[in-house]
Amino acid sequence: MARFVALVLLGLLSLSGLDAIQRPPKIQVYSRHPPEDGKPNYLNCYVYGFHPPQIEIDLLKNGEKIKSEQSDLSFSKDWSFYLLSHAEFTPNSKDQYSCRVKHVTLEQPRIVKWDRDL
């Protein structure tokens, strides 16, 4: 019994140590469908591999925040977290779209531009 209690305590201590591990987010920005000027589409910003879970994600059009929806926070087997932020948009050759991410591991917000050719 004492051995079981010791193992449980050791497990809890190792889990509490997860807060000390900080991982910067990885960011992918892409459209749901191949882009066509003037045709409605969805812009996605997939942010993954980060820890701790507190994060702020904004989709931008020409540097200005646009209305978006976000998935529920989820975690991977390695206890890192991931989220998907998305918004409906109509691409054209004049506008520039990007994703801005703020996280404790980043000295300043990271902005990743959408490349319509990817």
UniProtKB/Swiss-Prot annotation:
Any one of the GO CC terms: MHC class II protein complex
PROSITE patterns (UniProt xref): IG_LIKE (PS50835), IG_MHC (PS00290)
Domain Ig-like C1-type: 25-112
Extent of the signal sequence: 1-20
Superkingdom to which the source organism belongs: Eukaryota
Key words of the record: Disulfide bond, Immunity, Immunoglobulin domain, MHC I, Secreted, Signal
UniProt keyword RNA-binding present: no
Cellular location(s): Secreted
Pfam families linked: C1-set (PF07654)
Main location, first listed in the record: secreted
A molecular-function term among this protein's GO annotations: MHC class II protein complex binding
Similarity section: Belongs to the beta-2-microglobulin family.
Subunit structure: Heterodimer of an alpha chain and a beta chain. Beta-2-microglobulin is the beta-chain of major histocompatibility complex class I molecules. Forms a heterotrimer with MR1 and a metabolite antigen.
Protein name per UniProt: Beta-2-microglobulin
Species assigned in the record: Bos taurus (Bovine)
Gene (name only): B2M
